[in-house]
């Protein structure tokens, strides 16, 4: 079954629906989201993508990411995917948005207007093995060290988020999530 995404312009205005695989083959700018879940001890939840994923399999990434469906609100899509991938339900707060374009393989390009959401996880993940191979908590100050130590083990969008917003940005997102929970 084909999956459709929302093609957008550089200001995140919707243009039309686009087939997910075509969007990634052709590098079509589309709407996406990235979720960062924190615990109350200052750790961030990372997931290792399942080996069967069509791109970036086996790489470590932020807590959850995905795309809204056409006619689906981005925040609602983030809540939906968090439950589908990790079996978690929690309040999510929008904290940032940015645009990036990166090749993720010889054939596929991520060109996303990425909305970043944060939340506090109070339960343990119950991941769908088709989506998530493993998960782990990492002390937030260690994230940038891990990205530098083993860059090939992490998704390109996690690198771009860490570069763009820095350790201070992620710390402020955690504080924002705690204040909102």
Annotated model-derived regions:
Residues 1-34, 40:
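Acidic, metal-coordinating catalytic segment for phosphate/diphosphate chemistry
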Residues 40, 49-51, 97, 122:
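Histidine- and/or cysteine-centered catalytic micro-motif in compact active-site loops
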Residues 42-45, 91-92, 115:
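Conserved active-site beta-strand-loop modules that form the wall/rim of enzyme catalytic pockets
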Residues 88-97:
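A short coil-to-beta-strand element that immediately follows conserved catalytic motifs
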Residues 19-21, 58, 96-101, 108-181:
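Nudix hydrolase/Nudix homology domain
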